[in-house]
Amino acid sequence: MAELACFVSFSLTEDKVKWFPINKKAVKTMLCAKVEKDQRSNYYDTILYGVAPPPEFRNRFKTTERYGLDYESDQYSEVANLLADVLNMVSMPTEKFQFDIVKTVVQVRHLENLLLRIKDTDDILSENVKLRVKAVMIACNLVNETETTPLTESNEIVYQDSYFTITKLDYSSHKLLPLMADEYKITINTKTDIPDRDQTAFAAYIRYNFNKFAAISHGKRHWRLVLHSQLMSHAERLDRKIKSDKKHGRQFAYDDGDMAFVHPGWKACIGQLCGGTTFEVAKTSLYSVKTSKTVRTATNKIESDLISMVGN
């Protein structure tokens, strides 16, 4: 994770907020600077290279002893430039600006994936500036907007129908925060009601073709397919998010769209966590709740249909 302030700084003019990308030399200077404790929440002036992120976020950056953002990579500068460009397009009035916005946690891997989409000249995100702004704002958690298929982070499509798209998420070649994990993302193509029969058919497709994976939600109406062995760690992460929001007086909002394909154990566990149940109790639901009979029947039909085709 990393805060917005790890990539951009700002200045206040008479009528609007002006955003600037932070450069890698400024970050490097900040990491070796001695800063008084009461000044660590402020942006650091490097004198030579402009403003650097607040030193309180120094642990977000990679060093020889620590895993973190590779600020010396080209992708760091590209993400910083992208964020500054998009935030300047949004044109935030000075009187509405609050400093806490720079402490907003952004989705770093999501942003690096968006860079790849923008560079792909065949992708609509390459030319559609309005769509690009919205996609970046979603990745920065700065808008309450559903991440539909046109706005999603990856364009490596592995499945698509009238309502849903599954894209593969490959973070292994990332430079900022590489991650070796097999994951997929599910997004809706449009904001229309999806008939139960189509949800069931999609749930059966996932269960049959992605049987090593479970469909989970972090509550923002898009979904991930993660390995069953990773369910517990994802649930722990969401539990920490719920506790953090409660501690800081924020309302945690969870909306999985009540989709038929969401893993039943995940749905039960997160429902309990949102209701105040301890993680130790709620986690027992992760692997104990069975898939609905309707979805199991639809999955069996896929298998029987395939066997019939082979027989013919």
Curated annotation (Swiss-Prot):
SUPFAM superfamilies: Rotavirus NSP2 fragment, C-terminal domain, Rotavirus NSP2 fragment, N-terminal domain. Keywords: ATP-binding, Host cytoplasm, Hydrolase, Magnesium, Metal-binding, Nucleotide-binding, RNA-binding. GO terms for molecular function: ATP binding; metal ion binding; nucleoside diphosphate kinase activity; ribonucleoside triphosphate phosphatase activity; RNA binding. Gene3D superfamilies: Rotavirus NSP2 fragment, C-terminal domain, Rotavirus NSP2 fragment, N-terminal domain. The keyword Nucleotide-binding applies. InterPro entries: Rota_NS35_C, Rota_NS35_N, Rotavirus_NSP2, Rotavirus_NSP2_C, Rotavirus_NSP2_N. Its cofactor is Mg(2+). Residues 202-238 are annotated as: RNA-binding. It comes from the Viruses. Its EC number is 3.6.4.-. The active site is at H222 (for ntpase and rtpase activities). Belongs to the rotavirus NSP2 family. This is Non-structural protein 2. It comes from Rotavirus C (strain RVC/Pig/United States/Cowden/1980) (RV-C).
